[in-house]
Amino acid sequence: MAISILTVPCGAGGLNGSSSLTLVDIAELRQALNLSYESDSWQKEGGASKINTTVISGAPKITGLTEFKTYKVAATSDGKIVTVVTGGIGTTLKTGLGANKLSTFIETIGATTTKKLFHFNGYDPVQVWDGIAASTSAIATPPADWTSTSHPALGVSHNNRLWAFMNHRVYYSVLADHENFTGTGSGSLEIFPGEGEKIVCGISYANRLWLFKYPKGIYYVDDNNPDQTYWSIRRHNSEIGMSGPLGIALADLDVHFLSSEGRIHSLARVQEFGGITSGAIMPEKIGKWLRDTCKYSLFDKAIAVYYPYKSEIHFAVTDVSGSDNNRRLVLDLHDIETPKFRWSDRDTACSMSLFTDSNSKKKLMVGDAAGFVWELDTANKNKDSAGYNCIFETPEFSPVGLSELNPLGTGKVRVALQYLEVVFEPKGTHDLNVDVYGDGQYRYTVTFRMGESAGGAFGSFIFGTSTLGGGTISNTRRKLFGEYRRIKLKGYNNTANEDFSIFSMMLGYIAGSDRT
């Protein structure tokens, strides 16, 4: 009897958490944990290593993080601003700030037209540092109503001014003097005070200042005319908003953000005065999953950072039982026509930013809840020398009856499994385990060696390489057995410094018995 083959293309689809099976395709994944879609394959995501190998004194949460000039600058939960070096704290720039305040940083031009770093936390006076002085200083000329513990939580550099927000009002500095909010040319604007609770976020995009309110409301300021009397404020959308200041990222020519209702949106696709789902990225595939697995009440602490090296946006969020950002939902945009989601539970990211590594690449770094700053996506697939789980899991599918109406097959007849063949890039003489599920139950595990190019264990066939000792692409096959209506495959590896890169899986089968 001729063997039929069903090919599962790895890397063609991403995480799909839909509860409707009609919206799940065989190329998609029901679990994509600590996985990467590099090279349009399934790989273990890059590792993590400590930037400061000595803990910051007191082991505080890293509540804010940025790179400024040659420094890595962190705000900590014990009210400090410090530079971070291998040995922990390089310089303590400020003490005595409010405890446990989410901090934001913005680099812009100060009063002397030199680059300066501005720190906001919504509680203390805005801090300014030039990268030379031994400490930060409070902004010299704030608006009169920035007093006591009422201060902006975020600033935005836009059209050669610094802009900041409190309640329903946006403040702007003197042109080209970002420390001066009282001089000629400075001022403030009310943004639809009868709508939403307050402005929580802003970003400069497409030559406009965009403002987001909690729980709903997107607005923009058109300030392109040099005469301020001609500036205009417009409502863009009244049904979508945000929870906090950092859940937004500019990615090439678009802005992506996490809404207060747990959807990820493209600002370029949010229609003016549009409906609640306008601009949402695959809401049917990832929206419910995000809302079911993450804590709504902590969306105000969510952070989004665009990682240009791999064309990914990383959203740091908190799971339903957590108190800090302990999940990363990653939107992979390297194939802009087919965006894909994946997620990670490996790292705590109370703060997240980019930094420049020794090869001048912009890399991701996160600040945890225990006094450490970590580099992500390291070449070695370990976290501080320890292994971590990497799991891919297909939907449950039937090889028979696949169609547009039945994207996972009909399951009307049994098939007798013959083999599973994996096409992969050799990564080393270690194993990838694949659990085989039949009709909803775990049945057995098959193991694929990820580096041999010839020979193998009984029941394993390895072929397709160009030379002995390994090639760029290899195939390896394992015998399967059992008759089932529906099959699911779950692959995993959790060993330090072991990797895999799977391009496709081919399931060989023949017609099974007709017993019920």
Model-derived features: positions:
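Surface-exposed extracellular loop regions of Gram-negative outer-membrane beta-barrel proteins
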Residues: W210-N237
